[in-house]
Structure formats: C-alpha cells, structure tokens
C-alpha cells in the first residue's frame, strides 16, 4: 500500500524531490521535498485508490467511527469520498472560526459524544490536524484518530501528535517515497544521502552539502 501510493504521488507530480535544488517552505526552512496532494483531485484513478486506502485504514484502526471530518481545505474532498464509501456523515473543520454568519469552525454536524476520525492530506508538523482535533474535542466529540495520505515522518510532528494524545496513520510516508524514487531511477545514491540526512534533522541545513 505505502509504495503503491508513493508511486502514484510521484507519477502525477503531487510530490517533488529536489535534494540538489531545495524548496523553501513558508516557515523559511529549506527542504528537499514538496508535497501538493491537491493534484490528486485531478486524477480519478489516483483519488479512488486514496479513498479506498483511507477507508481501509479507518476500518482497521477505527472500526467504531461514526463521523468523518475533513481538514479545511485539502482534506475536505478526500473526507467526502471516504464518507460516501462508508455511508457515514461528514463534516469539515476550519483552521479558525468564521468571522461572519454563525461563526462556525465546524461545518456540518459533529455532535457531542460522536466518534470522529479526521482525514488530512499531509502530516508535516501536525499543527493543522491538531487544530482540527481540538475543535472537535471542544464540541464534545470523541476523536478516535487521524488518517492521512502522506507523512514526512518528522520527529516534531510525531511529538506534537503524542502530546495532543492523538494517534495517526498514513497511507504512505517519506521512507516509502524515497525508496520508490530510487527504484525508479529518479534519485541516485548522493541524492538519497541528502534526503536521509534532512529527515534526521530538518532544521540543520548541513544536509544540503552532505
């Protein structure tokens, strides 16, 4: 599953690896990888594989789920497809409450006591997913956990999720993706070394000259 999804993401350009020409994230951090899972929306077979995979993760790890919640905005479409496959109610959660109307942060119904699984497109530092979890908890929901398409496997993300007492499962991850990229001849040994060094300590830019 992990390598299959990784292959899909690489093939459609949803994930780019540029260890020799790093991206700069909005945080200012240099990175050899950039992920834009929104591109999956334009590829029916890929998004269908993702929806099936997310459904499988949910059934395996969170069989008592009652509501599927998407993170705004990237998780909304995938949450909708998964909830449709599972015949479950769906809602989505904004990063913050609206400044007009009813001022909702949660759109759709997520009622007190309901068991919810959050669908996220990408786990980086875990911030947006945790914001979603906290909003649902404040509404009285029981958040069973998070499922996502991809994770960078960053220690900072793992630590934040653990601190928030939330479990998370991803369809694919950084390790599987770099392995598939190497198998496809998209990166060589020197590039793989840089990719491995970045994951160990993303904040240390020494990986750029590794």
From Swiss-Prot:
Task: Name the enzyme group at the top EC level.
Answer: transferase
Instruction: Set out the biological process GO terms recorded for this chain's protein.
Output: 'de novo' UMP biosynthetic process; pyrimidine nucleobase biosynthetic process
Instruction: Tell me which cofactor or cofactors this protein depends on.
Output: Mg(2+)
**Assembly and partners?**
Homodimer.
Tell me its family. Answer: Belongs to the purine/pyrimidine phosphoribosyltransferase family. PyrE subfamily.
Name the HAMAP family on file: PyrE
**Any idea what this protein is called?**
Orotate phosphoribosyltransferase
Q: Which organism is it from?
A: Bacillus cereus (strain B4264)
